[in-house]
């Protein structure tokens, strides 16, 4: 049996829709329905008082004892503030295409479910709300048809709320409030910016935020660093999905700090705007499923489907610091704009967050982090100290931060791959990609990549250096990449170039492969605005899979103390032409790598030659581009040692020796030696011994010089400048039949030359023949034999110069012979071999 509460006097007489609502309750009692539904008729009175709805929900329905499950009101205008603070409802509320003149207050209420389908409302205050079912604040038409969206002028407050089902805001249009303001209306000065739903451009809205400064007449941000919030839901708990999908649109911050989502956070196709602030803040959030910030159908979309596959768009800073996503972090097809990259950005009083397009420091992703497809970021994307359970995918992405840091992944740990790959389009960036101290489990794949330096540096980086603003210094390239080079300045003025693009991955640990293929710097022809760098100092990888052309693209690279175990291009990856002689091909391959190393670490040597490999021909850089002091500063031996070690492990000892010989040659030139030491080292160890790898050279030089000397000695003998020694003359006068006399030793010019050159070996020539000037005034005939240790012999020759050239030649041969034989012995034994590569991966020099 049903009982009906008496209508309070304040509602007498009831309005038209109020009467229909009471009649629907009576009808449900008679027909035993569990739904109470009414719909306004256009042209009639569509108003219904909020206080009446409160009495109806908390008084009439409980008193009737009818098991009503849902109350649905369509097309009505709710007049006044609907206050349900602390209420415990037993029915699910549904307002479809209704217009509220004041906010709804659901603070600390408990409801089975709550639905706002289409319509308009100033604000929703529902802190600590408990919803045993789902909370739906969504458009009536999922396709976003005009007139079916839900418009909320102010903010939705759900701090500490609990939703047992889904929280669905598909197609909702949210305005914003000041975070510290408890009212629902924004200030009149900025209300048209955040609370209107006209299709104004972001630039127009940004300009509308600015007001004149009374002191200097300039324009500064009207927000003054204050936080504008569209959804304030710190500590929100949602057991199901949280959906803000297309055509969702918010003009303030979606604040989800510390929230817990049991399934997915889906923002596919959403548009978020908060110039100078956060568009989304989910710091410390816990998401058990996947977080989507892309397009609804990115896996099957291309540019031809752009109209029906909208991108996620964020104009401001999206923040995920410290968040944990158990599934994927999927930003594929997303479009992120930092405030500093929007037209009209104010450089008078900027904020630090103006440079961030996406900030996810310390984020933990259980599966893949995807930034693929049509993903584009205008500003800095930072994943500092992030943890990725599988792959970090930037396939076909575009990262724009001209001359500054477009991507910061310092300290990141990726269990799978880092993919900088081209798909339907190349991976493109005009900024720097940082992976300092990163830990990559399966490798970095950089293939089909374009680094563009055609445009000017970003205004933010120019502002940072012109004003020395320390807030933006972190977004500039490291000082290690600055260049003092006339190639990058006008009229050959040597200025410091503080902008660059490329990859900066010092001390990165790559367990798998580092792939560097099909990489190009743009523009290919013309004058770039800033250099293209590849900085891998101290990094390590198991395998390097590359092509020579890609290494030749960067203007500068640094692989000092870089460690790797193998080069995939030696056998599998490097494809030789059919019928090509493999030893010659290997020699050409290694020569090309040496030329690349010389361009970076021996630049003055590389200036005199061109790098050629197949169809590749790079002209030498002008000599004025690098001074000797700069060449000495840039020289580093470790890259040569590492290459030699890898070649030797691969069984290419001959090529490894060539690399080490080139290293020692460069060490002689750029090791900081003074010019006499350079000349002496270059002649003795370089020319005569090839730094220990040409040990036959001293013997060959000795034989060649012996041949030249033999000609000179033969001429001297014919002119009687070389005569027998005194005991050899006695043998001439002795009787030949006397057995006690030694036999006569005839003169032999080649043997005499060798006898003067080779030490510690007696060939019976220099003991039996002497230079004629040495037999007068210095040695008394018949008294003693000639001794090479007698200093008077040399002083006599010096006093008789220059007509004693044959004697000078003998002295030179003596010293030269000692030098050549010592070098020969040192080369054979390996004592004088230079550039010994380590047996294990070096830790650095």
Regions found by a protein language model. Give the residues of each.
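Membrane-interface segments at loop-to-transmembrane junctions
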Residues: 732-743, 808, 812, 840-844
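Core alpha-helical transmembrane segments of integral membrane proteins
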Residues: 677-770
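Short, well-ordered loop/turn and helix-capping segments at boundaries between secondary-structure elements
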Residues: 649, 665, 717-718, 834
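Pore domain of cation channels
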Residues: 764-842
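Hydrophobic, well-ordered secondary-structure elements that form the walls
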Residues: 656, 712, 828
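N-terminal leader/targeting and pre-domain segments
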Residues: 1-681
């Amino acid at each position: 049996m049903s009982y009906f509460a008496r209508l309070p006097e304040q509602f007498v007489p009831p309005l038209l829709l109020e009467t229909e609502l009471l009649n629907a309750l009576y009808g449900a009692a008679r027909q035993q329905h569990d739904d109470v539904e009414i719909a306004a008729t256009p042209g009639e009175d569509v108003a219904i008082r909020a206080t009446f709805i409160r009495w109806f929900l908390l008084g009439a329905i409980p008193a009737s004892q009818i098991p009503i499950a849902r109350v649905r009101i369509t097309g009505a205008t709710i007049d006044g503030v609907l206050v349900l603070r602390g209420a415990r409802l037993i029915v699910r509320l549904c307002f479809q295409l209704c217009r509220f003149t004041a906010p709804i207050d659901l603070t600390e209420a408990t409801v089975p479910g709550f639905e706002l389908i289409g319509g308009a409302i100033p604000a929703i205050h529902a802190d600590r709300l408990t919803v045993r079912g789902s909370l739906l604040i969504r458009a009536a038409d999922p396709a976003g048809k005009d007139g079916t969206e839900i418009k909320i002028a102010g903010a939705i407050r759900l701090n500490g709320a609990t939703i047992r089902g889904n929280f669905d805001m598909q197609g909702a249009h949210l305005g914003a409030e000041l975070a510290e303001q408890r009212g629902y209306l924004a200030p009149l000065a900025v209300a048209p910016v955040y609370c209107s739903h006209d299709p104004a451009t972001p630039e127009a809205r940004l300009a509308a935020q600015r007001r004149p400064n009374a002191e200097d007449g300039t324009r500064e941000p009207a927000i003054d660093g204050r936080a504008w919030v569209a959804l304030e839901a710190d500590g929100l708990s949602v057991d199901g999905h949280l959906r803000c999908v297309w055509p969702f649109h918010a003009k303030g911050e979606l604040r989800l700090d510390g929230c817990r989502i049991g399934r997915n956070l889906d923002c596919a196709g959403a548009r978020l705007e908060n110039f100078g602030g956060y568009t989304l803040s989910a710091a410390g959030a816990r998401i058990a499923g996947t977080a989507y910030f892309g397009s609804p159908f990115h896996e099957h979309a291309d540019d031809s489907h752009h109209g029906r596959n909208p991108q996620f768009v964020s104009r401001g800073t999206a923040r995920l610091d410290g968040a944990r996503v158990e599934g994927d972090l999927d930003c594929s097809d997303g479009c992120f704009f930092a405030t500093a990259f929007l037209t009209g950005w104010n450089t008078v009083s900027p904020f630090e967050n103006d440079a961030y397009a996406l900030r996810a420091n310390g984020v933990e992703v259980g599966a893949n982090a995807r930034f693929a497809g049509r993903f584009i970021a205008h500003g800095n994307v930072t994943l500092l100290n992030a943890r990725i359970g599988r792959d970090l995918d930037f396939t076909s992405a575009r990262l724009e931060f001209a001359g500054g840091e477009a991507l910061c992944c310092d300290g990141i740990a990726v269990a799978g791959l880092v993919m900088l790959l081209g798909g339907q389009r190349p991976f493109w960036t005009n900024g720097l990609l940082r992976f300092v101290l990163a830990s990559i489990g399966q490798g970095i794949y950089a293939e089909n990549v374009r680094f563009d330096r055609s445009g000017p540096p970003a205004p933010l980086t120019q502002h940072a250096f012109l004003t020395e603003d320390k807030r933006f210094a972190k977004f500039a390239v490291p000082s290690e990449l600055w260049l003092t080079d006339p190639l990058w300045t006008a009229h050959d003025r040597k200025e410091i170039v503080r902008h660059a693009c490329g990859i900066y991955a010092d001390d990165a640990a790559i367990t798998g492969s580092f792939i560097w293929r099909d990489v190009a710097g743009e523009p290919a022809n013309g004058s770039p605005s800033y250099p293209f760098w590849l900085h891998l100092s101290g990094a390590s990888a198991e395998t390097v899979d590359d092509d020579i052309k890609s290494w030749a693209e960067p203007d500068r690279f640094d692989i000092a103390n870089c460690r790797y175990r193998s080069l995939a291009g030696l056998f599998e990856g490097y494809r030789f032409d059919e019928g090509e002689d493999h030893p010659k091909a290997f020699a050409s391959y290694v020569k090309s790598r040496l030329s690349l190393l010389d361009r970076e670490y021996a630049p003055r040597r590389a200036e005199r030659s061109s790098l050629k490999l197949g169809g590749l021909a790079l002209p030498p850089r002008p000599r004025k581009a690098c001074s000797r002091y700069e060449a000495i500063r840039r020289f580093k031996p470790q890259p040569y040692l590492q290459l030699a070690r890898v070649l030797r492990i691969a069984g290419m000892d001959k090529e490894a020796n060539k690399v080490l010989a080139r290293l020692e040659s460069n060490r002689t030139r750029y090791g900081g030696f003074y010019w006499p030491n350079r000349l002496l080292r270059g002649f003795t160890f370089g020319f005569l011994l090839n730094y220990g790898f040409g040990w036959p050279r001293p013997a060959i030089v000795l034989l060649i010089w012996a041949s030249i000397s033999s000609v000179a000695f033969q001429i001297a003998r014919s002119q009687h400048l070389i005569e027998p020694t005194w005991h050899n003359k006695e043998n001439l006068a002795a009787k030949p039949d006397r057995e006690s006399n030694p036999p006569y030793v005839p003169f032999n010019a080649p043997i005499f030359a060798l006898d003067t050159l080779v030490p510690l070996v007696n060939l019976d020539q220099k003991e039996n023949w002497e230079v004629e000037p040495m037999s007068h005034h210095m040695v008394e005939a018949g008294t003693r034999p000639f001794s090479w240790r007698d200093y008077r012999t040399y002083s006599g020759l010096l006093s008789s110069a220059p007509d004693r050239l044959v004697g000078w030649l003998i002295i030179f041969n003596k010293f030269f012979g000692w030098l050549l034989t010592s070098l020969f012995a040192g080369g054979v034994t390996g004592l004088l071999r230079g550039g010994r590569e380590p047996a294990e991966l070096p830790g650095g020099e």
